[in-house]
Each structure stands twice: as C-alpha cells, then as structure tokens.
UniProtKB/Swiss-Prot annotation:
Subunit organization: Homodimer; homooligomer. Interacts with DNA; one dsDNA binding subunit is constituted by three p16.7. dimers.
Coiled coil spans: 30-60
Biological process annotations from GO: DNA replication; viral DNA genome replication
Protein name, entry field: DNA replication protein 16.7
Naturally occurring in which organism (per UniProt): Bacillus phage phi29 (Bacteriophage phi-29)
Superkingdom: Viruses
C-alpha cells in the first residue's frame, strides 16, 4: 500500500515538475514573441528613417551639368513641358537658394515670376521726362 502511495506521490511530483517546465517554456516563448515584435517595430521605424534620408540625399544631390539639385531640375522640366519660359535671373537665384523639396522650388519660382511680372509692368512716370 505504501508503495502505491509513493508511486502516486512520485507521479504527481513528476507531473508538477513537467507542468512547471511547460509554464516556464510558455513564459519564455511569450517573452521571445514580445521581443520579436519589438524588433519588428524597430525595423519598420529604421526603414522609414532610411527612406526619408534617401529622399533627402536624392533631393540634395546636384546635377553637375546644370549645377541644380534633382528636385529643381524636375520642377524646371515641368515648366518646360508646359511651354513656360523662366527668366535666367530666377534660375540663377534658384541655384543659390538650395531649396529642399519640389513644392518649395515651385513656390519660389511662382513668387519670383509674380514679382518680375509686376516689375515689368511698371511704367515710367510721365512727369519725369522734360
């Protein structure tokens, strides 16, 4: 009788130990899954940062033939496709501005075109000639 009781107690101890190990393995698996999820989030963040940096680099890269950045050349190509001529003064000023995005370049050119249009519409005051 005592032998059967001892075998039963040993069986319960073995089951308890195995279930404890199983719980530890489940806990470790959950921790590893959380760690993997955190690493995946970091990879996504780093990929976004890398793509933003690559975009900035491509916008800042200078075309050696015309001495303008890629975004400036793209905007000037849009004007050329639309058969709109840009005065050389605006292009010369554009070289010195070093604008970062195509929208900034477009806004700058439009502002300068408006300014030059107003300047060219000025007339000489009639009273100045005598």
């Amino acid at each position: 009788m005592e032998a059967i009781l001892m075998i039963g107690v040993l069986a319960l101890c073995v089951i308890f130990l195995l279930s404890g190990r199983n719980n530890k393995k489940k806990q470790e698996a959950r921790e590893l899954e959380d760690y993997l999820e955190d690493l995946n989030k970091r990879v996504v963040q780093r990929t976004q940062i890398l793509s933003e940096l690559n975009e900035v680099i491509s916008n800042r890269s200078i075309d050696k033939t015309v001495n303008l950045s890629a975004c400036e050349v793209a905007v000037l190509d849009l004007y050329e496709q639309s058969n709109i001529r840009i005065p050389s003064d605006i292009i010369e000023d554009l070289v010195n501005q070093r604008l970062q995005s195509e929208q900034e370049v477009l806004n700058y050119i439009e502002t300068q075109r408006t300014y030059w249009k107003l300047e060219n519409q000025k007339k000489l005051y009639r009273g100045s000639l005598k």
